[in-house]
């Protein structure tokens, strides 16, 4: 399989994950495909598989202060790689939340070092922002 086919198959797997959640059913596959191009092109994503089937997906962005403010207000990422503030954008799990959280803690602790902030914005099924949270990377996650 060539790299382009592999990328297309991965994005297709992720679209299936998105489409399994009610909040994304109104979006077309084309809309989701276009949305996913940025994190895929920047390699700011991880797909989890269980029994050779996609089970979870996470993507993230690195924002500067200006884009971070916009993201916290709108929930929209306009520039996925413009700063050093890490935001977990989408965390979707069909049946693999534990593995996804464990991987995320380890990955960002190794990438950023200990004591660094990782942020996330929680949005409900009606696209209303209901919580902005953060966690701190730890040595024990490495």
Give the role of each language-model region:
Residues 1-32:
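Short amphipathic alpha-helix that is part of the acyltransferase structural core
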Residues 2, 33-39, 108-114:
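Short linear motifs in intrinsically disordered
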Residues 11-17, 36, 40, 118:
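Generic hydrophobic, helix-prone segments enriched in Leu/Val/Ile
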Residues 35-51, 56, 62-67:
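A short helix-loop-beta-strand connector motif used in the catalytic cores of GNAT acetyltransferases and
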Residues 139-142:
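Short, charged interaction patches at domain edges and termini
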